[in-house]
Amino acid sequence: MTAEKIIDSLRFTATEADEQKDLFTPSHVLYKCRIINPENNRRYTFDYQCNPSATHEPTKEDCLYCLLSDASCADSCTDEADFLTEFGYIDGGADQVRKGLKAYKACKRTAAAIDRIFTEDEKTALNEYYKNY
């Protein structure tokens, strides 16, 4: 199946979160999103932030790209220390290390969800599709 067909087949919802906390900037909005793969009925619910005044509300394509990107960050690192070093958390003191560990764990959860939702062939097709997104 092509990436376009996979993306088209996914069910997607994005709802503005009741509680707007830990935002990237005051202009960002936190959404609760869900992607469902109808091929296996597996789903993933996740938080997503964007600045709708600068771009637009979340789309299935944008959210899926971010999920795949986060998953690849975790998959490309051998362990927590590698992640902290690769993404610059190691040099910022204890607070930065804590933030980095939180980010690493979130990326690992996302990678596990992507592995659960999609087959290897689907992941390959999607990663190729988003290569230059």
Positions of the model-derived regions?
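Acidic, low-complexity, intrinsically disordered interaction modules
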Residues: L23-L30, I36-F118
